[in-house]
Amino acid sequence: MSFLNTINIIGSGLTAQQLRLDVVSENVTNSQTTRVENGEGAYRRKMVVFEAVSGRNSFRAAMARAAAGAVPNAGAAPNAGGVRVTQIVEDEETPMKMVYDPTHPDADEQGYLELPNVDMVMEMADAMAASRAYASNVTAFNTLKSVISSGLEIGR
């Protein structure tokens, strides 16, 4: 695996986790929003969907070629790919919170107010997980930098 390919993989992980943190912060920010821009109900929690990106020389692709009877190229450098965000989806499964507040302008005829389905504990857990995954990618990048630097020192 080339160093540049490794940097691309780490970069894709950093980008994906940054987007995950952005979505968590949007959820926390809108945790009390009772009406979205189009005026249709309260804000719904959003979630990020990730997908592993398999390169042309990834382990999965090599196994598929071997199963098809192709002779694997032993000298080929693996191209693992990384990770990408496929979509940001709204949480349709978690019910909205209903609170009795007849004085609120967005309350229904019975006086109930629909609040977002954002659970602050879940959001904090997601933020911590994304932050740790981001930090792991930074550590991997720093390790790669150290390896490259050591290689350059040996070459002198």
Which ranges hold each PLM region?
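Amphipathic alpha-helical polymerization modules
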Residues: 1-156
